[in-house]
Amino acid sequence: MTRQCPPQESGAALSGSVLAEAAVVFAVVLSIHAAVWDRYSWCAVALAVQAFYVQYKWDRLLQQGNAVFQFRMSANSGLLPASMVMPLLGLVMKERCQTAGNPYFERFGIVVAATGMAVALFSSVLALGITRPVPTNTCAISGLAGGVIIYIMRHSLSVGEVIEVLEVLLIFVYLNMILLYLLPRCFTPGEALLVLGGISFVLNQLIKRSLTESQGDPVDFFLLVVVVGMVLMGVFFSTLFVFMDSGTWASSIFFHLMTCVLGLGVVLPWLHWLIRRNPLLWLLQFLFYTETRIYLLAYWSLLASVACLVVLYQNAKRSSSESKKHRAPTITRKYFHFIVVATYIPGIIFDRPLLYVAATVCLAVFIFLEYVRYFRIKPLGHTLRSLLSLFLDERDSGPLILTHIYLLLGMSLPIWLIPRPCTQKDSLEGARALVPYAGVLAVGVGDTVASIFGSTMGEIRWPGTKKTFEGTMTSIFAQIISVALILIFDSGVDLNYSYAWILGSISTVSLLEAYTTQIDNLLLPLYLLILLMA
């Protein structure tokens, strides 16, 4: 996040910040490797080494403008931190499920790790293939690491699991070609790897479960169908509006009609097929099942109203000011972080399944409103463009505004990714008890405090970056205080004397926040989740 110290622009400074970011990522990789210590963790180490070398090739391609697609230019490629998320997440999921004696989800964790390695290797091969002259040494390192990974995975995965990994890789390749063409400057290569890799895996899981008629928790199917449905809707309308003007009333009416058709004719029947009941009735019964849920929904509605009032108030201030290019200051943008923290903490403490579903619904609403804004759909399209432009920052350089969606994802992914079948009564012991709070700690508290204190009182900059030492230290301190408050108010959290690991995890992720130029709302919670679950 921004801290208002002038950044250094020299190539040496940039290289230093990239090296520091890489050092933090390697510290995480080696920590997980030491905790797991099997052939899969050795694969993760090999992947990190090759991603470190290939990352510089991506950076050079971006600087020279020779990348295949138009990527976000205000950051480095971010290949190394993004490449390690899915593999490390799969490794820690495998360990937890192996300890819990759940062989099915243990294998699922291995598939997640293998899939993450496959898409990361593809991104590396893409960079090496378009680099001129061909980087012989980097190709040798990448080929050696890739050969080791493929050899180990070939002798570890079943034929069905190999096919599943290849299916995800195929979907990932097609999504890259489609979405990176339709959405220029919205992603760095690392962000594209992380976001599109996750979407590809979700899409493949939904197809697999639909074809096999597998049984599962309806809330999991609800998340899968909503994510895939919204992505397919975006691809459909992006393709359609290439041939017609989306800003007319006729196009807007057609947009709303087709949204209803896709929702009622595709998404709802698909969900009905998976959960074997009426989706709308199930959702209503689920939301109003207990009095606690009714109170939480009322409380969240109040917070949503407050967020809307903040947006309207800030835009009213802009209208009355002399400069129409006025942008909200850092502290104003952090209001939404405070609101999100106030939203998630009661949900985590009192009713996590409700929070799981509510976050899914909120994600669908956010994406739909972004479609309305992006396509200028009447009657709200132009209004949303005006209201949200106030809160843009340097990361919103493409046609889409994704910061608020990344914030929601960063807070929700720790809730969605908990391996519930591998936990005892949906609870974890030790540092793992804080896994649901990973988004709250890393983004809601840590990133917010770091940004506010760094921009107002920060003087000592970390080398090669505009982030400040004071901001990072206050971030760590605020997260420690938050952990203490969680212990007081959440009786289900038992840290079991794992305080040193928690402090190390928080400090490591705070250092990553100081050096990364990627979307920290998404990256930081995932790394904290991985460390806490290890």
Swiss-Prot record:
Segments on the Cytoplasmic side according to the record's topology features: 1-16, 94-109, 154-161, 208-220, 274-293, 351-355, 419-432, 490-491
Keywords: Endoplasmic reticulum, Kinase, Lipid metabolism, Membrane, Transferase, Transmembrane, Transmembrane helix
Region named CTP-binding: 455-470
InterPro entries: Polypren_kinase
Protein name, per record: Dolichol kinase
Role summary: Catalyzes CTP-mediated phosphorylation of dolichol, the terminal step in de novo dolichyl monophosphate (Dol-P) biosynthesis. Dol-P is a lipid carrier essential for the synthesis of N-linked and O-linked oligosaccharides and for GPI anchors.
Locations listed in the record: Endoplasmic reticulum membrane
Pathway per the UniProt entry: Protein modification; protein glycosylation
Family: Belongs to the polyprenol kinase family.
UniProt membrane topology term: Multi-pass membrane protein
Primary localisation category: endoplasmic reticulum
GO process annotations (BP): dolichol metabolic process; dolichol phosphate mannose biosynthetic process; dolichyl monophosphate biosynthetic process; protein mannosylation; protein N-linked glycosylation
EC number: 2.7.1.108
Substrates-to-products reaction catalysed: a di-trans,poly-cis-dolichol + CTP = a di-trans,poly-cis-dolichyl phosphate + CDP + H(+)
Gene Ontology CC terms: endoplasmic reticulum membrane
Keyword GTP-binding in record: no
Transmembrane feature ranges: 17-37, 73-93, 110-130, 133-153, 162-182, 187-207, 221-241, 253-273, 294-314, 334-350, 356-376, 398-418, 433-453, 469-489, 492-512
Ranges in the topological domain labelled Extracellular: 38-72, 131-132, 183-186, 242-252, 315-333, 377-397, 454-468, 513-534
Group of enzyme by EC: transferase
GO function terms (MF aspect): dolichol kinase activity
Gene from which this protein is expressed: Dolk
